[in-house]
Regions:
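Multi-pass membrane proteins that catalyze or facilitate reactions on polyprenyl-/lipid-phosphate substrates
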Residues: 1-288
Length: 288
């Protein structure tokens, strides 16, 4: 993998990780177009999530470092348990699906149809209440919102997040839909989806770096050993995370501002168009 290829894939990761369009699906498509394959590429696409989740921590640092608010961390833990448990039990099946662009295309289409109607299915509760994403959000407003998010709701949203194990579904879309189904406001559901991404993606990255076995020249190794096996790999890892971090910050700011005004419809249309294009490319053997 060249630095340019690493930058392209990192841009795709940063742009799509927190939008309801599936970052995994888009990276599979990007890899197919770039013609990059192999264990390091698979490791790289997961490891650069570290840069993306750091963007959430930086943007919401006041939230993450309120150590007196222990319930915030407890609710995140409850929300992440379903994905961690199922991810561990069905790791091989999930990895097999990651090799299928057809699965991505179908998931993009079906998810797009859902997003077209999501605002009608789950109308916004509490109209006229303070916007949690307003620039001058007060501490009391955030506390009020946190109190509405019970442990039960956190767990059920985490169950929705399991759907994102299917490539093309989108972790962001699944968890936001789960939040809205639990009667959270659209903006608060998106905010909690960002928070939930941090432990979920950190666990996935840690597993790929320190526990999962990869191959380097036919020899088994751990992820961090594969990254440090060559200067090129190390440079790609560092540059990829930096690019993913910067792009993710911009994408999150765009998304929360857009979501406040317009909702999910445009993302549904995009997913449907992207799914149709990918199906055509698969039928014509342009992408395999």
């Amino acid at each position: 993998m060249t630095i340019i290829e690493a930058i392209i894939i990192a841009i795709v990761e940063g742009l799509t990780e927190f939008l309801p369009v599936s970052s995994t699906g888009h990276m599979i498509i990007a890899e197919s177009f770039l013609g990059v394959h192999g264990d390091f590429v698979k490791l790289f696409t997961v490891a650069i999530q570290l840069g993306a989740i750091l963007a959430v921590v930086v943007l919401y640092w006041k939230k993450f470092f309120q150590f007196d608010k222990w319930e915030f961390y407890a609710k995140l833990l409850v929300g992440v348990i379903p994905a961690l448990l199922l991810g561990y039990l069905f790791n091989e099946q999930i990895e097999a699906m990651l090799e299928s662009p057809l699965t991505v295309a179908i998931s993009l289409l079906l998810g797009g149809i859902v997003l077209l109607f999501i605002d009608k299915w789950f109308p916004q509760p509490g109209k006229g209440k303070p916007d949690l994403f307003a620039t001058e959000t007060t501490r009391s407003e955030l506390i009020e919102a946190d109190e509405k998010l019970t442990y039960k709701k956190s767990f059920l949203i985490g169950c929705w997040q399991i759907l994102a194990m299917i490539p093309g579904v989108s972790r962001s879309a699944a968890s936001i839909i789960g939040g809205m189904q639990q009667r959270l406001t659209r903006n608060f559901a998106a905010e909690f989806s960002f928070f939930l991404a941090v432990p979920t993606m950190f666990a996935a990255s840690a597993y790929t770096l320190f526990l999962k076995k990869w191959e380097n020249g036919g020899q088994p190794c751990l992820g961090y050993e594969l990254i440090t096996a060559s200067t090129e790999n190390t440079q790609a890892f560092i540059v990829g995370n930096l690019v993913a971090f910067v792009v993710a910050i911009l994408a999150i700011k765009f998304f929360i501002n857009y979501l406040k005004k317009y909702g999910f419809k445009v993302f549904g249309i995009y997913r449907i168009v992207a799914g149709i294009i990918l199906l055509i490319l698969l039928l014509t053997d342009t992408v395999q």
